[in-house]
Amino acid sequence: MSVIWKDAIRSNAWPFIEAKKILDSLNGKVPEKGYVLFETGYGPSGLPHIGTFAENARVVMVQKAFEQLSDIPTKLICFSDDMDGLRKVPSNIPNPEMVAQYMDMPLTSIPDPFGECKSYGHYMNAKLCTFLDKFGFQYEFYSSTNCYKAGLFDDMLIRVLEKYDEIMALMLPTFREERKTTYAPFMPICPKTGKVLQVPIEKWDARAGTVSYKDEDGNDVEVPVTGGHCKLQWKPDFGMRWAALNVDYEMYGKDHLANSRLYSKICQILGGKPPVQFCYELFLDENGEKISKSRGNSISVDDWLKYASVESIALFMYKNPARAKRLFFDVIPKNVDEYITLNQKYHLEEDMVTRFANPVYHIHHGNVPKIETFGLTYSLLLNLTAVCNPSDKSVLWGFITKYEPKATPNTSTYLDHLAEFAIRYYHDFVQIHKSYLVVSEKHKIILYDILDMLSNITDQTEEENIQKAMYDIGMKAGYKNLRYYFKDLYQILLGQNEGPRFGTFIKLYGVEATKKLVEEKLYPVA
């Protein structure tokens, strides 16, 4: 066992834990197919959303962790269930009336409502691939339609016929009585309408490779199960795919957890070995409801990247994947600042166990760039933006270079992007919620004391000395809990409930500018 292997496992980082599970399941040996197969899934009923990014980002973290522990080659496939019948029309697409005419049709048989691709399914698949390519994911794309029609699943579909009774015995106890009478693992594609039919199967013939059902006119119809003439119900389809492709690792959301036993059992019935599995919790919107592609009630990845870097969103995905998290715009600043802190800690740390435990190791797959913000944070730049209301980042850079002469937009590109993001976020989310506290007589005394303090320091005064002086003023004012003192100051000076360390803020904004800010609150212009 190598030192890297030992340190990685000791780090207790969840990607390494998952990677070890895969290696253990293989007994450390190369699979017969010659590589370890990681799979992610995509339901193309709606546009790719942040959950799509999350699943792929997390699986790649495990894939890269596995590559640290083993020399066995790996492959990632992204599988699109584009042969599914349309069950409802998403609320966030154009031409919904047109799409509604194609209910129960395979997604790849519905005209593209956007007017750009061969079909609805092709459009969504193209969006997925563009989405994954944008973030540099290395994957192979698999289309359910192509797999069924090209015969990739034919052998397994015949095996489903051979194991029909065993699969039905597994599935039927999971349904209500009325569904038991109509359920069948196969869904024929209607030769007349092209719809995916959920009908009882009257007969099945493993030798002929066919199933029979009655159409809406009561006529017997016999169709082959191969060549794309049928598809499986989604639960048997999941297990069949694992067996057909010999998948070694799959992640899925909590909505699949209750059925995971069925997927695994069907895979075994068909002669396959179920993959190592990981269940992640779903994202919730700001109202605590599950995010949905068809409803479009989530932050898109593009939305996030309008206000922050991709590293911050990757950090959000890394943290506690088995815990449900609310996903709304308020989480962005915190994740940016946490990423900055973790990045700095990583490069100061020499112990490899601690480095392996740091999320940035997995976000960057072991190749962590070193960023320098000179002690400035996203939150601090937001607060600076709040008081100077800049139209562009050059205004912020005037304060930044005064605070740290070494920093320039050209040499500090991360900080330059941070300034741009902060201005955009402030104007879209902070400014509209500003609410200033009315200055009371008690507050006036505090503000006069702050003015006196500012008159006795310079821009060269140490941040800690300024911070201590601010603490002393709060204590003198009689605040038992200084949190309320600072909250009052934030509401008076910034119009918000939270804010920066004043020592750092005053150093960044400047003593004279801060004096002017305080004076504006003491002597408001009528």
From Swiss-Prot:
Q: Where in the cell is it found?
A: Cytoplasm
Major localization class:
cytoplasm
- A Pfam family it matches: tRNA-synt_1f
Disulfide linkages recorded for this protein, renumbered to the chain, are none
Q: Which PROSITE patterns match?
A: AA_TRNA_LIGASE_I (PS00178)
Chain positions recorded as ATP binding sites: K293
Q: Which reaction is this enzyme known to catalyze?
A: tRNA(Lys) + L-lysine + ATP = L-lysyl-tRNA(Lys) + AMP + diphosphate
GO cellular component assignments: cytoplasm
From the record, which residues define motif 'KMSKS' region? 290-294
EC?
Answer: 6.1.1.6
Q: Which domain of life is it from?
A: Bacteria
Q: Which UniProt keywords apply?
A: Aminoacyl-tRNA synthetase, ATP-binding, Cytoplasm, Ligase, Nucleotide-binding, Protein biosynthesis
Name-wise, this protein is Lysine--tRNA ligase
What organism is the protein native to?
A: Rickettsia typhi (strain ATCC VR-144 / Wilmington)
Classification from the root reads: Bacteria, Pseudomonadati, Pseudomonadota, Alphaproteobacteria, Rickettsiales
